A protein has these predicted regions:
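A solvent-exposed interaction/effector surface
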Residues: 1-180
Length: 180
């Protein structure tokens, strides 16, 4: 019984450490933008986390198979977000140093993110805390009288992933909201 109690206590400590997270609003910066390869889907908001991993893999595999250089970390571009319906249209992409022309039938496309002023927020922790991180960023915008640039889209860059960092408390995601 004492051994089992000890194991249960140890498990509790480990799980608590894995649940730790921090959200930091880094401030307004200039994001350099650039070309990227991507694929897009529509889904329920609750499915973004599970879908993005396979989409990143699909884009990465396409780039590897076609000898296309990667520059930077995978990112998610939110094309449309509808809280009322619970639906989202998003793209999963990987930056590349130059424009790539893809065949007409390709599921993987090329896009360009402009150099733009953005509010940068950093989440260190599990993706389940992303909503709180986005809410924190929007609250900062409101509290500091910043104006959202409506003609561009929010995006998040994943510096780490579950594939290469097992502990969710160590995952790092940068959130970017374009501002004027």
């Amino acid at each position: 019984p004492k051994f089992q109690t000890g194991l249960n206590n140890m498990e509790s400590v480990v799980l608590n450490k894995m649940d730790k997270y921090t959200i930091n609003v880094d401030g307004v910066i200039q994001h350099g933008g650039g070309y990227y390869m991507y694929t897009t889907t529509a889904s329920k908001i609750s499915q973004v986390d599970e879908k993005m991993a396979s989409m990143f893999s699909e884009v990465s595999t396409y780039m590897d198979e076609n000898g296309i250089e990667k520059s930077g970390n995978p990112f998610v571009l939110y094309n449309e977000w509808n809280e009322n319906s619970g639906n989202v249209i998003f793209s999963a992409g990987i930056f590349t140093p130059s424009e790539v022309i893809t065949p007409a039938a390709s599921e993987i496309l090329t896009g360009f993110l402009p150099n733009q002023k953005v509010l940068k927020t950093t989440l260190k922790g599990d993706y389940k805390n992303l909503k709180e991180a986005w809410d924190t960023a929007y609250n900062y915008i409101e509290a500091n009288d910043l104006e959202i640039a409506e003609d561009t889209k929010n995006f998040e860059v994943h510096l780490t992933s579950p594939e290469n960092v097992a502990n969710p408390a160590k995952w790092i995601t940068h959130l970017y909201i374009p501002v004027k």
